[in-house]
């Protein structure tokens, strides 16, 4: 594999990506000798060797960057065993040679498309923070604002159908769109099957090349739509024009690249139609923030974006459930609770100390309702989410008749009080078209937590049935992991501070159980009405003199 090794002296680590040591290797490629360089960082073999084509021996191939660096692995996918540094080098070199061979033969030519944005970044002179829906294949106008100051120039763009744009812009980018200059930006999706090589290092496409992309790689329908956009009355921008191209790539994704260019100075005439005098094309990258992209990027679920979930009770368990629904991609969440947030609860609540108090109109310090504090926090973290907060009890809302409960795709009950939840269960079962309803609760001292799904599909499942009386025994929850008739309540300063002991970890486990199965329900993957439980360790419970139930003892799974 290696025919010759020559050590390079006086290595500039800044030039060679942190490598302190460099060697020239003569290898055999397609039966002929070829030169490649390998670099080692100080901590080798604790890190992978880096390979460079410094002499441009292999021409332009995918995964080779402008400094000659050959990116042969996306991550530290190769397991490193420090005991065998030579084997590590040879293993990596095999991968590099295979990658180069595919590049020379053209076998991985489509990787140029897959890595288009990575190459594009090498030539850009600015950035657009863009919320672009790449699943929409129509030519269309995009909102775009430029914030300029003596030391800063920020360009932000968003689809016109994104709600609460001004709030989102202020939350994410700290700009006031009403104070910034607005420019026309047109999104142009290129035809499927379009093949465009990304620009080589430090190569910039000229006006003719960009116009050729526009002329040859969009559909007739797209051209007609483009003409309608630029001819709209009052829609011309004489100063600057922004264009964002969407290039379909083979993994069903879309690469984005953008330009800003001077306007034509003529109403209803775009620079891609008529070349302006002294045209200067400035390439821009697009940093994405569209909610669909962010959800796909982080494992969220776009299938539930149109779902509306209501959570009744946003204490320790309910608040964790609400925040996890927001992270999961549910775009409309209603939170219902008439309780206030208190300092006593923050260490097992999704909200922290800073959410407990606020000042009223008379500047008096007051406790904030849980739902209002939770709405504020979710909106701050996830501004795309629509949150409706109702600081009332379920009973109040039911008696008012102000809510059409069947409009919810899912109802989660996390009050943690059996009598109230049995009442809700009765009311839900009395409806003609009740929404699927899930009940969630913790048990004390880390022994477990539960989630009961009801009214899903065949409208079966009943919370109250868990408390069905048995002859000679008091009523108790038959799903419980604790023996009946035990009092777990504690107090620190008297009756006013009574609480049931469980930790934030218990609430998070129960919330995860609920949300995981709720997502299955909302996407049609869960058809029945199961009782689901997580089983914890019983050591603390027993150390305090309590006993477990037969269900806990007979269920050996945790």
Summary of predicted features, one role per range:
Residues 397-406:
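Short amphipathic alpha-helix with an adjacent loop that forms part of the alpha/beta core around
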Residues 340-383:
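Glycine-rich phosphate-binding loop and adjoining beta1-alpha1-beta2 segment
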Residues 255-309:
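N-terminal charged helix/coil linker that caps or initiates catalytic domains
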Residues 65-76, 80-123:
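Domain-level detector for trafficking modules
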Residues 10-77, 85-90:
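Compact alpha/beta protein-protein interaction domains typified by the UBC
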Residues 297-340:
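Glycine-rich adenosine-cofactor-binding loop
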Residues 391-394:
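Conserved acidic residues
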Residues 122-267, 406-410, 414-558:
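Glycine-rich phosphate/adenylate-binding loop
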């Amino acid at each position: 594999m290696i025919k010759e090794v020559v050590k390079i002296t006086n290595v500039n680590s800044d030039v060679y990506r942190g490598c302190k040591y460099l060697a020239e290797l003569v290898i055999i490629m397609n039966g002929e000798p070829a030169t490649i360089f390998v670099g080692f960082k100080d901590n080798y073999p604790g890190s992978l060797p880096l390979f460079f084509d410094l002499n441009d021996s292999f021409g332009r191939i995918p995964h080779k960057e402008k400094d000659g660096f050959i990116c042969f692995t996306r991550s530290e996918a190769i397991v490193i065993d420090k005991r065998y540094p030579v084997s590590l080098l040879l293993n990596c070199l095999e991968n590099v040679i295979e990658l180069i061979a595919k590049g020379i033969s053209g076998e991985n030519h489509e990787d140029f498309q897959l890595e288009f944005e990575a190459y594009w970044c090498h030539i850009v002179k600015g950035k657009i923070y863009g919320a672009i829906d790449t699943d929409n294949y129509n030519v269309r106008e995009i909102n775009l604002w430029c914030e300029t100051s003596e030391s800063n120039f920020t360009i932000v763009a968003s689809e016109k159908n994104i709600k609460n744009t001004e709030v989102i812009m202020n939350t994410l980018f700290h700009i006031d769109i009403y104070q910034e200059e607005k420019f026309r930006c047109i999104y142009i999706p290129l035809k499927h099957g379009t093949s465009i090589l990304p620009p080589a290092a430090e190569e910039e496409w000229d006006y003719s090349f960009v116009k050729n992309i526009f002329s040859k790689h969009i559909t007739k329908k797209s051209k007609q739509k483009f003409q309608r956009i630029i001819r709209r009355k009052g829609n011309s921008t004489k100063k600057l024009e922004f264009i964002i191209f969407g290039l379909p790539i083979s993994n069903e994704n879309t690469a984005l690249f953008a330009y800003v260019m001077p306007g034509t100075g003529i109403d209803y005439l775009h620079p891609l139609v008529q070349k302006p005098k002294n045209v200067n094309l400035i390439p821009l990258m697009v940093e994405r923030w569209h909610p669909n992209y962010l959800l796909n990027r982080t494992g969220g679920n776009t299938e539930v974006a149109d779902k509306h979930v209501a959570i009744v009770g946003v204490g320790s368990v309910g608040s964790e459930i609400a925040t996890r629904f927001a992270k999961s991609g549910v775009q409309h969440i209603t939170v219902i609770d008439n309780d206030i947030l208190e300092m006593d609860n923050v260490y097992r609540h999704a909200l922290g100390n800073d959410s407990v108090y606020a000042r009223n109109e008379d500047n008096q310090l007051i406790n904030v309702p849980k739902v209002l504090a939770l709405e504020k926090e979710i909106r701050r973290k996830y501004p795309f989410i629509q949150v409706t907060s109702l600081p009332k009890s379920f009973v109040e809302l039911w008696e008012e008749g102000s809510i059409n409960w069947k409009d919810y795709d899912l109802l989660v009950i996390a009050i943690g009080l059996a009598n109230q939840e049995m009442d809700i269960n009765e009311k839900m079962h009395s409806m003609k078209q009740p929404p699927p309803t899930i009940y969630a609760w913790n048990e004390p001292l880390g022994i477990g937590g539960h989630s009961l799904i009801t009214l899903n599909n065949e409208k079966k499942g009943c919370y109250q049935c868990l408390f069905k009386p048995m002859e000679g025994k008091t009523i108790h929850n038959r799903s419980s992991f604790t023996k009946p008739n035990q009092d777990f309540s504690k107090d620190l300063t008297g009756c006013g501070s009574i609480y049931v002991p469980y930790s934030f970890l218990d609430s998070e486990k129960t919330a995860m159980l609920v949300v995981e199965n709720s997502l299955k329900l909302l996407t049609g993957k869960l058809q029945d009405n199961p009782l689901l439980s997580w089983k914890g360790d019983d050591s603390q419970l027993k150390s305090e003199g309590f006993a477990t139930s037969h269900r806990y003892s007979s269920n050996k799974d945790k």
